[in-house]
Regions:
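Conserved small/polar residues in nucleotide/adenosyl-binding loops
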Residues: 241-244
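Generic enzyme active-site microenvironment
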Residues: 214
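Generic beta-sheet signal
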Residues: 36-37, 179-181, 211
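Conserved core of the PLP fold type I
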Residues: 66-206, 220-239
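N-terminal small-domain helix-loop-helix segment of the aminotransferase-like
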Residues: 2-106
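Helix C-cap/helix->beta junction micro-motif
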Residues: 31, 208-209
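Walker B catalytic acidic pair
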Residues: 217
Length: 244
């Protein structure tokens, strides 16, 4: 007999951003003159840069001719793109990351959700609070959490690390040792950024305890300060072989 993954039943309702969209839509209908500042889902507000438009047009034109037509890309992504990422996003910042360690995907949301599948269901998860919902929801569906606690409005069995004004909206090392630590900087949703010194403390902690940090740097392009790392690999020991 076919059964369902009952972990899905722990989720309290719809995806957070769908709920927000529904509430905004209802409010607009009741208040058509109101100006709404959308600070929920991070939708884009500006047109694509000319360089991107030119590249898209050029790529479409290539697909119109037999000599330049391309079928499926390699499973890990085009080599020229991986080489460019390795050089510009990593090596130019002193990170020892080579092209064969880079995988082209459809974005951080999918990767954040998919990477947890390689870990066992008995791993303890730590997340910032507030948190990007994907980190928690995917682990709920994988069976790494307890039930949803309506009173606390969070899930039992998850280590929540409060990010408050009093601690600069940065998580502090938890008392309970986690196995998987989700960090996102610049942070979604708070916008807080972490210094290289503070991030190094997390890397050192993970190496001491054997934890794995899942680091989401989707918003690194907003960084302008020199003491704010664009990648966790700017920290010593972030790669496992550097520690061992």
């Amino acid at each position: 007999m076919v059964t369902v993954n009952r972990n899905y039943l722990k989720l309290p309702g719809s995806y957070l951003f769908s709920t927000i969209a529904g509430k905004v839509s209802a409010f607009q209908k009741e208040n058509p003159e109101a100006r709404i500042l959308r600070l929920g889902i991070g939708d884009v507000t500006q047109p694509l840069a000319p360089a991107i438009i030119e590249s898209l047009h050029r790529s479409v034109d290539e697909m119109a001719h037999q000599e330049t037509f391309r079928g499926y890309a390699p499973d890990l992504g085009y080599e020229f793109l991986r080489d460019a990422i390795a050089k510009n996003d990593y090596k130019d910042r002193g990170c020892n990351i080579s092209a064969d360690e880079i995988f082209i995907s459809d974005g951080a949301k999918s990767d954040s959700g998919n990477i947890q599948e390689i870990f066992g269901a008995d791993n303890k998860v730590a997340v910032c609070d507030p948190v990007y919902p994907v980190y928690v929801d995917t682990n709920v569906m994988a069976g790494r959490t307890g039930a949803y606690n309506k009173e606390k409005e969070n899930f039992d069995g998850v280590i929540y690390m409060p990010c408050l004004e009093s601690n600069g909206f940065l998580p502090e090392i938890p008392e309970e040792v986690p196995d998987l630590i989700y960090l996102c900087f610049p942070n979604n949703p708070s916008g807080a950024a972490i210094t290289r010194e503070k991030l190094q403390e997390w890397v050192d902690y993970a190496n001491r305890t054997g934890a794995v940090i899942i680091y989401d740097a989707a918003y690194e392009a907003y960084i302008t300060e020199t003491d704010i790392p664009h990648s966790i690999y700017e920290c010593n020991g972030a790669r496992s072989e550097e520690h061992t």
